[in-house]
C-alpha cells in the first residue's frame, strides 16, 4: 500500500545548561514534528562548541544537522553557575568548640541567591584553647568552590540561651529522674514554667517513693540532636509544701562515661532501666570548685557555678529532706555562655587597589570605570564583605556588607560606566550643624545621618549621609546646661557637630 505523505512542521529546540569553562553535553537526538502522526526522535550531528563560547556566563545557540532533513536542530546553551560564595563568622568562648554553620549564602549568575551546604575542614582543639582568631576553610558541598569561616575566641562572655529547656518537636533536651511520683513527672522541670505554689502545681517530686536519695538531670540536645554542651552553671528552683522540700544534702555531677547515652525508655524512672549508663555510678563525676548562693532554700531559683565541663548530661543527686517524704523541683536551667558578636562595622571598597572614596551606608549606588575593574572589600570590627561580580551587560557589581553577628548592614551597587560626568567625584564643602533639646534625665536619641553639601557643575547638591557620633559624656544629661558632640561622616574626612541643650 502507498504510504501517506508527511511534511515536517518543525524540529523542537532543546535547552542545555553548563557551568563556565565546561563544554555542554548535547543530546544525541532531536524531536521532529510532522503534520500527521506522532513526533519522532532523529539522530543529530551538532556543530562543535569552542572553549571561548563557554568562557563567560551567557546564552548561545548551537546548530545541528539531521540526516535527510533541511531544517536545522537548535540547542540553546546557557552557561551558568555560582559566581560568589559568602564568608561567615562565629564567636566562641575559650575552650568551647565553635558551632560550624551548615550553609552559607551562594550567589548564582541568574541573579538569585540560595543557602548552599558546606563541608568544613576539621577544627583543631588547640585553635580554641586560648583567646585569638582563626580561619577555617570549607567548600560548597559537591563542588570545589571555597569559602571561609572566621572564628573569634574570647574570654569575654555574656549569658546565652537556656540549653536545658524543652525543644518543640523533639524529646531533646530531656529532663530525667532516677524516680518520680506519678502525679509530678520530671518533664515539668524544663518546661519554662516556674511555680512555687499550687497555682499551677508545676513540679517534679519523688513524694512517697521512699528513696533515701534520687537524682534529676538534663540530657542535652541541639535542635533535637543529642550533643555535648560546655556547662559551668546550674539553676534549680526547689518547691516546698507539707510533704516535700529542698534536699538536706546534694551533689552536682556531670556524665563522664565513654558510652554515648541513649534516651531513657522511661525518663521518670531511669533506675528501672538497669543497663542504662546513667545507672552506673562510675559514669558520673562531681563538679569541681562548686559555689552557690547560700543558703539553698525552696521558693526561689538557686544558682550554682562550677568549673566548665564538656558533657552530655548534668544532674543533681539529692537526699530527701528531714521530716519530708520527698524532694521537689519546679524548674532547672542551664545557661550557655556566648561571646557577644559585633553588630557594627565600617566598609572599605577598593577598585584596582585604590580605595573608593565617599562610601557611606546612606548611599548605595556608585559609578566606576567600566574597563575591567578589580573590586575587593574589607570590613572593620570583624565584619565581612562579599563581592558579587557583574556577569551580564548592564548589571552592577554588588558588595554585601555584614556585621560579625550576621546582620546585613548594607548592599552597595557599583555601576560600570564610561560616562565622565557620572565618574566625576563631587567635592564636599559643608556639613549641616544640628541641635537637640532634652529634659534632665532623658535619653538622648542621636540622628543617624547629617546633611552634607557637595559642589557640582551647576550648583550645590545635598545628601543625607550616615555619621558615627562620639560617646555622650557620662553626666551630661543629669543637669541643666549644653554641650557639643562631634561625629565622623563615614567615608569622608568630615566632622559633624551636634549642640545639645539640657533643661
Regions found by a protein language model. Name each.
Residues 198-270, 298-341:
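Aromatic, loop-rich ligand-recognition surfaces of beta-strand-rich domains
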Residues 157-196, 340-351:
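Predominantly extracellular/luminal regions of secreted and cell-surface proteins
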Residues 191-205, 352-360:
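Non-catalytic extracellular/lumenal accessory regions of secreted precursors
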Residues 76, 80, 135-137, 148-150, ...:
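Ordered hydrophobic segments in well-structured contexts
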